[in-house]
Swiss-Prot record:
Coiled coil: none annotated. It holds the Pfam family DLH. This is Probable 2-oxo-3-(5-oxofuran-2-ylidene)propanoate lactonase. Belongs to the dienelactone hydrolase family. Involved in the 5-nitroanthranilic acid (5NAA) degradation. Catalyzes the hydrolysis of the lactone to produce maleylpyruvate biodegradation of 5-nitroanthranilate. It catalyses: 2-oxo-3-(5-oxofuran-2-ylidene)propanoate + H2O = 3-maleylpyruvate + H(+). Transmembrane segments: none annotated. The active site is at C123, D180, H212. It is an enzyme of class 3 (hydrolase). It comes from the Bacteria. Its EC number is 3.1.1.91. Keywords: Hydrolase.
């Protein structure tokens, strides 16, 4: 699908008079299409994550990219310590309410099949993609290297993905590198154990030699082979669960 057939625009998905910005990318075609909510990493909406939304649109999906920092200003991300503070400051309940708002927006959009909604996220957005797998309207969830467990429970982080496995209703595809310092083999083993214990549908893809953020082409962590493989797997998974197709 050529770039010129993709419509891109900022939209407001807010409710009850509250503004919430999101970035919409969709193929310009007749008929209704499946849609994917995109959750960015802590860096928020940048060129990289817009490219992800556009790539989804080129693949035949309506993509709605949530601004996890809206309506507040973007946080200071100038060093690792401040990035960690920004992650800890994000209120999970607020972000998941934004996911609910995105679901309602897409269900009412003329270009969207309301019964074919998925979610995709990266890093902290990958964590939110997993937490949103509890949402009945979400039919599939794909997470790239999202944190599976929290070091502690706080008002902002009351429930981790591991805590939520029993409530998952969507099938899960999870991508992670075997060199990721935030997601070790013990955490993955516990995730697998709980998914199997609760008989949840999932696929776990581990990429040798890849660390955290291996899909993000603007970072030193980028690994092109792992990134392309993970993206191909993502399209296969989304198309199977949202379109009933077995091929990319």
């Amino acid at each position: 699908m050529a770039t010129e057939t993709i419509a891109m625009d900022w939209v407001d998905i807010g409710t009850n008079g509250e503004s919430r910005l999101a970035y919409l990318a969709r193929p310009v075609v007749t008929g209704r299409l499946p849609a994917v909510i995109v959750m960015p990493a802590i860096h928020g909406i940048n060129t990289y994550i817009k490219d992800v939304a556009i790539d989804l649109a080129k693949a035949g999906f309506v993509a709605l990219l949530i601004d996890i920092h809206s309506p507040e200003q973007e946080p200071d991300l100038s060093n690792a310590e401040k990035i960690q503070i920004a992650v800890e400051t994000l209120d999970d309940r607020k972000v998941l309410k934004d996911v609910d708002a995105a679901v309602r927006y897409l269900e009412q959009h003329a270009a969207v099949r309301a019964d074919r909604l998925g979610i995709l996220g990266f890093c902290v957005g990958g964590t939110y993609a997993l937490l949103a797998a509890r949402t009945p309207a979400i039919r599939v969830s794909v997470g790239f290297y999202g944190l599976l467990e929290y070091q502690s429970r706080t008002d902002n982080k009351p429930v981790s993905p591991l805590d939520s496995v029993a409530q998952f209703t969507a099938p899960i595809l999870f991508h992670v590198g075997d060199k990721d310092p935030w997601i070790d083999s013990k955490m993955l083993a516990e995730f697998t154990k709980r998914m199997q214990q609760h008989q949840k549908s999932y696929e776990l893809c581990i990429y040798r030699g890849a660390g955290h953020a291996f899909h993000e082409h603007f970072r030193d962590a980028y690994r092109p082979i792992a990134a392309q493989s993970a993206w191909n797997n993502t399209l296969i998974y989304l198309r199977w669960h949202l379109c009933g197709k077995r091929t990319v």
